[in-house]
């Protein structure tokens, strides 16, 4: 288009070119047995294992995107209605149902999350954020991916 505007050429020589189609990769998925192994991989004897199990339960139980998960606040969860309010793509609010295992895992995590602060285990820098890192701040999408990879290895799911 630049050469046409400058009068160097009259016709765009690329108009009749056909671009090659790039095959899309199929998304990575887990079978039910593998999902169960993954969710059971975090140790429930350590505080971050409890947090990580809650993360995995919510990811599996709701189908929430990682970017949405890291932006969750405690107030986004309605335990009575068994739902999570999510601010999704394009700032659109979505309501996702919570499974009973997800609710139990979140509740157990929240009990332990409060104990962390009492024991000065972490500083609560982000009191509203649902899932905290070891410094008391909001987890990032990258840290969630690291958590998933860590437990996939522990569960023997190295595909």
Residue ranges of model-derived segments:
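Conserved catalytic core of the tyrosine transesterase superfamily
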Residues: 1-159
């Amino acid at each position: 288009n630049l050469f046409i505007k400058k009068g160097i050429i009259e016709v765009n020589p690329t108009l009749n070119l056909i671009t090659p189609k790039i095959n899309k990769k199929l998304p990575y998925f887990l079978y039910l047995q593998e999902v169960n192994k993954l969710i059971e991989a975090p140790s429930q004897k350590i505080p971050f294992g409890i947090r990580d199990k809650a993360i995995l339960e919510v990811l599996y139980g709701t189908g929430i995107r990682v970017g949405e998960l890291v932006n969750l606040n405690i107030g986004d969860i309605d335990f009575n209605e068994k739902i999570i309010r999510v601010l999704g793509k394009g700032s659109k609010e979505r309501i996702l149902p919570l499974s009973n295992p997800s609710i139990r895992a979140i509740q157990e995590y929240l009990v332990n999350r409060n104990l962390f602060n009492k024991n000065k285990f972490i500083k609560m820098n982000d009191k509203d954020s649902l899932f905290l890192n070891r410094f008391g701040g909001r987890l990032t999408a990258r840290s969630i991916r690291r958590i998933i990879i860590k437990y996939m290895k522990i569960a023997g799911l190295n595909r």
